[in-house]
Amino acid sequence: MSKTNARKPIYKSLYVQVLAAVTIGVLLGHFSPELGAQMKPLGDGFIKLIKMIIAPIIFCTVVIGIAGMEDMKKVGKTGGLALLYFEVMSTLALVIGLIVVNVLQPGSGMHIDPASLDTKSIAAYTAPGKMQGTVDFLLNVIPTSVVDAFAKGEILQVLLFSVLFGFALHRFGGRGTMVFDFIEKFSHVLFDIVGIIMKVAPIGAFGAMAFTIGKYGLGSLFSLGKLMGAFYLTCLIFVFVVLGIVSRLHGFSVFKFVRYIKEELLIVLGTSSSESVLPRMMEKLENLGARKSVVGLVIPTGYSFNLDGTSIYLTMAAVFIAQATDTPMSLTQQITLLAVLMLTSKGAAGITGSGFIVLAATLSAVGGVPVAGLALILGIDRFMSEARALTNLVGNGVATLVVAKWTGDLDMQRLHQGLDQPSLQESQEPEVILDQQVAHMAVAKSHG
């Protein structure tokens, strides 16, 4: 066995390091809450490091993918199929959440009087003007300036500019070769930076978890444990049953895929942010044989439109509040709730605290269910956000592979090789694997 493929000692595995860091963070937050709460800057710092690199990585990936394509019609086809998939799956997630919360009824028997709830804590989420309309949302996709889009890290704005830049570079043909080569080399530097940042992922996961447990405590988990259990169960059903069926129909196993991205899942568990692994997910999906142009379009768009975990949360939280406050909801009202959420969940994409903003706007629009009931779930929202982020991450990964297969841009041999031999993949950093693949392609091209 070559040195490159030699398996690393277990203590050097990022998976083991993050798992240990999360465990230590939980213990510190539980036994020393005050000290645990002070660890917040460690988690925030790691997420900021990742966000620093997301916009340029999306730009390079999308531009290289589009400018290197022979058929420009494929870009529009890929985008259209991705949006169709997102709409179907997010609607399915809303429906499943609605069914499970009606069957398990986690809020039944609580008999909460809405007038007795402290609404000051939710004022920031229910203030007028927080919720975007459809027109405002679409206009917000267009940046005021390119610099502004990159400076603020607005994913959809960066994606729009990247697509236009890729189209323009493609039209230049041979005259744009120098620019194309520069962007391609620049992307390798960016992914190397990601590799450096990921070395401190355990520190970020430790800080974020210590803060969460230190501030909110394990007690808040038990006080609303029935809702927590129902929500986590629903997310598991969605990932391993719904996405499992979708994966099987497209020739791969969701169980193997989850194992393949286990390091990313652990980092998301620790940080409660699926954005913290966006660059690394893009690399790993390319390593599985998905074309760069598909990965570059589907993943960033999915982070705004394909939030399966958030969709499950929205219907379950809304009906839970109705059950807890003894507010009857007829079938017609629940169907109306579903229809409104199909629209409002898209309008709040990318907004901080979007779960509460969407819920507040939706409950107000549907009527009947007291908005004050949001105060009930505020205390456990942080813990539920972890399940949301994990489900969103797996959902976007599966979506990318499915859309790539639909458009004929998925190398099934590489997919099965990557999923069936995880030990080989784990023995190397994704950046190393990607660089090796680029080198092989360059050699093949020179011989061709």
UniProtKB/Swiss-Prot annotation:
Q: A GO biological process this protein is involved in?
A: L-aspartate transmembrane transport
Q: How does it sit in the membrane?
A: Multi-pass membrane protein
A cellular-component GO term for this protein: plasma membrane
This protein's major location comes to membrane
Compartment(s): Cell inner membrane
In terms of Gene3D superfamilies, this protein maps to: Sodium:dicarboxylate symporter
Assigned keywords, A-Z:
Cell inner membrane, Cell membrane, Membrane, Symport, Transmembrane, Transmembrane helix, Transport
Q: Where are the transmembrane segments?
A: 13-33, 49-69, 81-101, 149-169, 193-213, 227-247, 294-314, 335-355, 357-377
Gene Ontology MF annotations: fumarate transmembrane transporter activity; malate:proton symporter activity; succinate transmembrane transporter activity
Q: Which InterPro entries match?
A: C4_dicarb_transport, Na-dicarboxylate_symporter, Na-dicarboxylate_symporter_CS, Na:dicarbo_symporter_sf
Q: Which family does it belong to?
A: Belongs to the dicarboxylate/amino acid:cation symporter (DAACS) (TC 2.A.23) family.
Give the matching HAMAP family.
C4_dicarb_transport
**NCBIfam families for this protein:** PRK01663.1, PRK13027.1
- Physiological role: Responsible for the transport of dicarboxylates such as succinate, fumarate, and malate from the periplasm across the membrane.
Q: Under what name is this protein listed?
A: C4-dicarboxylate transport protein 2
Q: Which organism is it from?
A: Polaromonas naphthalenivorans (strain CJ2)
